[in-house]
């Protein structure tokens, strides 16, 4: 099934603005992120901790609705879903 991935800020520099990913039925948010990390070591280094878990500061949205990166990674994805990936936001 096809899902769209949109990347922002430093993740955009690594992955590009957006990409369509063909993933197996039943894939979860985490399995998609790991798939992206497998093909992009720079993304994996930025998004995942040394122990392999997603860094808690990574912001995720599915279909423009924010999800909790610590508790919602097992959400199954559906055909046509859009996953947005944001790095931490800082400012002053």
Task: Explain the meaning of each model-derived region.
Residues 1-91:
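Ubiquitin-like/PB1-type beta-grasp interaction modules and other compact soluble beta-rich domains
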């Amino acid at each position: 099934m096809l899902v769209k991935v949109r990347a922002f800020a430093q993740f955009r520099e690594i992955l590009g603005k957006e990409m369509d990913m063909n993933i197996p039925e039943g894939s979860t948010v985490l399995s998609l992120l790991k798939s992206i990390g497998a093909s992009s070591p720079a993304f994996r280094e930025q998004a995942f901790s040394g122990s392999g878990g997603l860094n808690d500061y990574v912001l995720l949205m599915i279909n423009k609705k924010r999800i909790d990166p610590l508790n919602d990674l097992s959400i199954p994805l559906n055909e046509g879903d859009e996953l947005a990936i944001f790095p931490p936001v800082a400012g002053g």
